[in-house]
């Protein structure tokens, strides 16, 4: 089982949803980076439950630094981070342990490995993404040294959506962070949709967009290591992710070349582009424009409506998430922090690779 992501800057996550703790080991972080346990709090709080319409599971998600930091600075050695699971309730999973959960990876996992941890999804649980968010904090610090910043936000939930990519600014970022749903969409409309889902015991998918500051470093390579290819690999590894696009993406199939192609212009005595339909990447390499993309998330599979299933002995049965179960009606809201982290992790790795591209 592969639990490592990245090349020069890499992370290895470990732990299960209902185990004592989860964690991550980060390799390749340069020495001298300022790092304090409090640096993790803002990002971890954006992923944590507790917002309106999210899972009632209450995890403090305090990040403990076990290695790789001395006197507030990274030492260049592996950084080990640990997050304790403090609100585990396994009883609801034991009650239906004899049958497969529709929409989950339990059956596939068992067929591949011969056994499975059924408690909260075990290793395949979205609980693992807390480790990615923690590692993403360190990646963001590396990128900040090169004036590269990323912001993710909920751009679609139900009928509410924003199709364009706003320009990244401190004001826009603050508006997103101040929103209970990390979204520029109407908060009242989102809350109404989530309340309806909870009343109907149902769930809904969503879309998370990400935008960056202009990336003047030439990140990515022209063949297998295209920036969008590495982003797709990382972002599509997020639980419940079902689609990825960069720039105009799938909408470009409805465009003429004369409409889609971004013209080159001179701006402030530098070569720039008059539009950014490409999403900031040409030939798989960033070209000084913002990097923009979207990730589609499926509806949460854990809902209280009953579904046909089979038992582990092959008998027809019914599966319904218990009333005591704690799940999100829309995973895309809490996935915002995870998308932002994965983009930062990919870009930090590509940035360090770029340092080795030529003399």
UniProtKB/Swiss-Prot annotation:
Q: Can you state the subunit structure given in the record?
A: Homotetramer.
Q: What is its EC number?
A: 4.2.3.5
Any Pfam family the entry gives: Chorismate_synt
What reaction(s) does this enzyme catalyze? 5-O-(1-carboxyvinyl)-3-phosphoshikimate = chorismate + phosphate
**Which stretches are annotated as coiled coil?**
none
- Tell me which residues bind NADP(+): 47
Q: Do the record's keywords include Metal-binding?
A: no
Give the cofactors, semicolon-separated: FMNH2
User: Which residues span the membrane?
Assistant: none
Domain of life assignment: Bacteria
Q: Write down what this protein is called.
A: Chorismate synthase
Q: Which UniProt keywords apply?
A: Amino-acid biosynthesis, Aromatic amino acid biosynthesis, FAD, Flavoprotein, FMN, Lyase, NADP
Name the GO cellular-component terms. cytosol
Its pathway is: Metabolic intermediate biosynthesis; chorismate biosynthesis; chorismate from D-erythrose 4-phosphate and phosphoenolpyruvate: step 7/7
Keyword Cell membrane listed:
no
What is this enzyme's class at the first EC digit? Answer: lyase
GO MF annotations in UniProt: chorismate synthase activity; FMN binding
Q: Which NCBIfam families match?
A: aroC (TIGR00033), PRK05382.1 (NF003793)
Family stated for the protein in its record = Belongs to the chorismate synthase family.
* PANTHER family hit by this protein: CHORISMATE SYNTHASE (PTHR21085:SF0)
Ligand binding (FMN)? 123-125, 283, 298-302, 326
The protein's role, per its UniProt record: This reaction introduces a second double bond into the aromatic ring system.
- Kindly list the biological process annotations in GO that this record carries: amino acid biosynthetic process; aromatic amino acid family biosynthetic process; chorismate biosynthetic process
- Which free-text remark accompanies the cofactor? Reduced FMN (FMNH(2)).
């Amino acid at each position: 089982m592969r639990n490592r992501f990245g090349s020069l800057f890499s992370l290895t996550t470990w732990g299960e949803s209902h185990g004592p703790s989860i964690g991550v080991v980060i390799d390749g972080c340069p020495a001298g980076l300022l790092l304090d346990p409090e640096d993790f709090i803002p990002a971890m709080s954006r992923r944590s439950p507790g917002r309106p319409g999210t899972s009632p599971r209450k995890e403090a998600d305090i990040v403990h630094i076990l290695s790789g930091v001395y006197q507030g600075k990274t030492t260049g050695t592996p950084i080990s981070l640990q997050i304790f699971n403090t609100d585990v309730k396994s009883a609801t999973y034991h009650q239906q342990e004899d049958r497969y959960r529709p929409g989950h990876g339990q059956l596939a996992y068992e067929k591949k490995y011969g056994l499975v941890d059924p408690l909260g999804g075990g290793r395949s649980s979205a609980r693992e993404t807390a480790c990615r968010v923690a590692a993403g904090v360190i990646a963001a610090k590396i990128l900040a040294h090169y004036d590269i910043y990323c912001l993710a936000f909920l751009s679609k939930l139900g009928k509410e959506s924003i199709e364009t990519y706003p320009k990244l600014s401190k004001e826009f970022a603050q508006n997103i962070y101040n929103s209970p749903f990390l979204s520029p969409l109407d908060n009242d409309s989102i809350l109404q949709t989530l309340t309806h889902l909870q009343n109907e015991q149902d769930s809904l998918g969503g879309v998370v967009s990400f935008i960056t500051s202009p990336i003047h470093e030439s990140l990515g390579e022209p063949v297998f290591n295209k920036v969008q290819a590495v982003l797709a690999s990382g972002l599509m590894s997020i639980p419940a992710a079902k689609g990825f696009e960069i720039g105009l993406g799938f909408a470009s199939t409805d465009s003429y070349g004369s409409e889609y192609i971004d013209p080159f212009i001179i701006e402030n005595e530098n070569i720039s582009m008059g539009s950014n339909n490409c999403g900031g990447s040409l030939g798989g390499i960033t070209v000084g424009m913002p990097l923009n993309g979207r990730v589609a998330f499926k509806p949460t599979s854990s809902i209280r409506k009953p579904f046909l299933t089979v038992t582990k002995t092959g008998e027809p049965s019914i599966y319904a998430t218990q009333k005591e179960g704690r799940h999100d009606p829309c995973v895309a809201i809490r996935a915002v922090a995870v998308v932002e982290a994965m983009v930062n992790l990919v870009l930090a790795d590509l940035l360090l690779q770029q340092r080795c591209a030529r003399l």
